[in-house]
Amino acid sequence: MRATDADWLDAAARLAVRARPLSRPNPAVGAILVKDGVVIGRGWTQPGGRPHAEAVALKQAGDRATGATAYVTLEPCAHRSERGPPCCDLLVASGVPRAVIGVADPDPRTSGKGAQRLHKAGIETHILDHAASRASLAGYLTRTALDRPHVTLKLALSLDGCVATMSGHSRWITGEAARAHVHSRRALADAILVGGGTWRADQPRLDVRLPGLENRSPRRIVLTRGVAPEGVEAISAPERIAQLDGVQYLYIEGGPLTAAAFLQEDLVDRLEIYRAPIIIGGGVSAIGDLGQDALADAHGRWALVDCRQLGSDSYEAYSRTR
């Protein structure tokens, strides 16, 4: 079966994830060069934001780039930097006759200009508004559009929706496979947040403890009106996340009150639920009171985007729909 443009962009989006979170402050972008159905170059944004994905892929392809199609998750940049020329100029110089772009860049320095420059140079250019590309750029797009990080709320709970027994015992609800997966998700975040209660009760390390990924531990944030512990930043209210400079992806592991606080402020973009096959009965609910009176208001807010088995536990990811 012949791969479609969307298929190649799917592959580029998977490459883009490799850039997180080390590409900051630049977005994590993926690029693939395809010629006669064969990948001749691939790249993703490098640590510190340079080189860009297109530059990496073009360097790998070399002279073979002439006649290839370029697949890029984000519209190639059109502004010159002291660290290198615009990516659209690199593509024009490479001799690619066709470019397929996943998402238009909302940055006013590039928005529309990158695609326009390619088109003026005679390159057949398409912008698809591609779902996987958009998902891989969620942090950048959220920060640009809403001036805040993309927020993921993680919950580990029992079949009956509890995060702890009534006595407060919560270690461990899920098994080793689920906990390792949590560490892989932490490694993709710029910052991780817990509530003051969780910090005082557990003193969590909030780091990444997977071999080879120790350098990807995120910044640690505590939601508290008190003084931040040493080595930890503090914010006093959920809406203050907008002030976290350099943070495109925020991962929340707080307790019921913290979860409710962010949900009430409509600041959660993604829910990640790790569900263990246990029943606690009468335990601590995963989410505090949201003041929800009508069930109709609760429906239609979340769509399942991923699910898998992790040992004996299940993992479900939901994206906000409204």
Task: Put a short name on every predicted segment.
Residues 33-132, 261-263:
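Zn2+-dependent cytidine deaminase-like catalytic core
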Residues 84, 107, 111, 144-148, ...:
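Short capping loops/turns at secondary-structure boundaries
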Residues 111-115, 137-141, 204-207, 283-286:
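Short secondary-structure transition/capping segments
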Residues 21-22, 50, 115, 126-156:
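Proteins enriched for Cys/Gly/acidic motifs involved in redox and nucleic-acid/cofactor modification
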Residues 20-23, 52-55, 78-82, 145-146, ...:
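Short acidic/polar alpha-helix capping motifs at helix-coil junctions
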Residues 30:
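Helix-turn-helix
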Residues 79-81, 107-111, 133-137, 160-165, ...:
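Short, well-ordered, mixed-charge alpha-helical segments that flank or form enzyme active sites
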Residues 2-26, 41-42, 60-61, 65, ...:
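Enzymes that bind and transform nitrogen-containing heteroaromatic metabolites
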